[in-house]
Design a protein with these regions (language model features):
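Active-site environment of divalent metal-dependent phosphoester hydrolases
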Residues: 46-48, 74-79, 101-103, 157-159, ...
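Conserved beta-strand hairpin/beta-sheet module of binuclear metal-dependent hydrolase folds
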Residues: 2-59, 161-174
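Short, hinge-like loop/turn segments at secondary-structure boundaries
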Residues: 110-115, 189, 225-226
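C-terminal regulatory/interaction regions
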Residues: 237-285
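Core dinuclear metal-dependent hydrolase active-site scaffold
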Residues: 32, 135-164, 169
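Active-site HxH/HxHxD metal-binding segment of metal-dependent hydrolases
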Residues: 45-50, 57-139
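Divalent-metal (often Zn2+) His-rich catalytic cores of metallo-beta-lactamase-fold enzymes
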Residues: 88, 190-247
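Active-site neighborhood of phospho(di)ester-bond hydrolases with catalytic His/Asp-centered motifs
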Residues: 41-44, 66-74, 94-98, 151-154, ...
Length: 285
């Protein structure tokens, strides 16, 4: 999907296993920045690498032109296709925050620490991180065009966003949750601070999230405000539940009860979702 003369969005379609032989359909976006060479922000999942490469060819570029891959965070739907990028363009460099680097370079470790049933359907393997990114770093992806690194933890400990001032383009990964979505983060307070930080970035014309089609204009602030309200709503739900449930209530039971309050009924909760609700309980302890 062409957004501007230099920015394209690519939607990856994949399935997430929520129980044995039970899947939900998911999507995630990568972003293609076109300059003298190609910069790819996030690589999607393992199974969609051929489609991403076909798209590059359709717009007149070669997968071998990818020279820079900033990674917003280390979750499977963002790193699963990295080995395919490396095979197509062996000289490509991969950039990530130090806190998420271990899960990119050791995917077996990520699977142990954050298990997903079909993890290895989504993730092909590890790649080496060429450079660790931190707040204020800049990456030049084309002549006269840069990406400035903004540390936006919460969704993961090493989540980053990237701002291209010359294009007014803010690439936020999963830093801003969708209104009504099941929460996926490790620290709700950090997520709130990160969204508030992004709201203050001057000159943003386009918001490029991992979960939603590109957003422009007044919708940007609305989307961020909706994300803040979603976290605050969940925090209040967990706070109220903690007043009535026994202290020894399991994370599974707490999550099921909280999801019911959100209008979502389930008998099984993914570990990443339990982590989200338990992070609220820890905050309110």
């Amino acid at each position: 999907m062409k957004i501007t003369e230099t920015i394209h969005a690519f939607k990856h379609l994949f399935r997430l296993a929520v129980a044995e032989n039970i899947y939900v359909d998911r999507t995630v976006y990568s972003y293609i920045l076109l300059g003298e060479k190609v910069c790819l922000i996030d690589a999607g999942v393992r199974g969609t690498a051929p489609q991403l490469q076909d798209y590059l060819r359709q717009i007149g570029r070669s997968p071998a032109e990818v020279f820079m891959v900033p990674i917003t965070h280390a979750h499977p739907d963002h790193i699963g296709g990295l080995p395919a990028v490396r095979k197509a363009s062996p000289a490509a460099s991969f950039y990530a925050h130090a806190a998420d680097k271990p899960w990119i370079e050791d995917v077996e470790r990520q699977y142990r620490e954050r298990p997903i049933l079909n993890f290895f359907e989504l993730v092909e393997g590890p790649v080496p991180v060429s450079k660790e990114l931190k707040e204020g770093d800049t990456l030049q992806w084309a002549k006269g065009k840069t990406l400035r690194v903004l540390e936006t933890p919460g969704h993961s400990r090493g989540s980053i966003s990237l701002f291209c001032e010359e294009e007014g383009a803010l690439f936020a990964g999963d830093a801003v949750p969708a209104a009504g979505a099941i929460p996926i983060y490790v620290d709700p307070q950090a997520s709130i601070r990160s969204i508030q930080k992004l709201k203050k970035v001057p000159g943003v014309k386009h918001l490029f999230s991992a979960w939603h089609e590109p957003i422009s204009g007044s919708q940007i602030q609305t989307t961020m405000d909706d994300g803040l309200r979603q976290i605050e709503k969940i925090d209040q739900i967990v706070k109220d539940l903690c007043k009535t449930l026994p202290p020894e209530t399991s994370g599974e039971e707490l999550s099921i009860r909280a999801l019911e309050k959100l209008g979502i009924k389930t008998g099984k909760v993914l570990q990443m979702v339990k982590t989200s609700f338990e992070s609220h309980r820890k905050k309110n302890a």
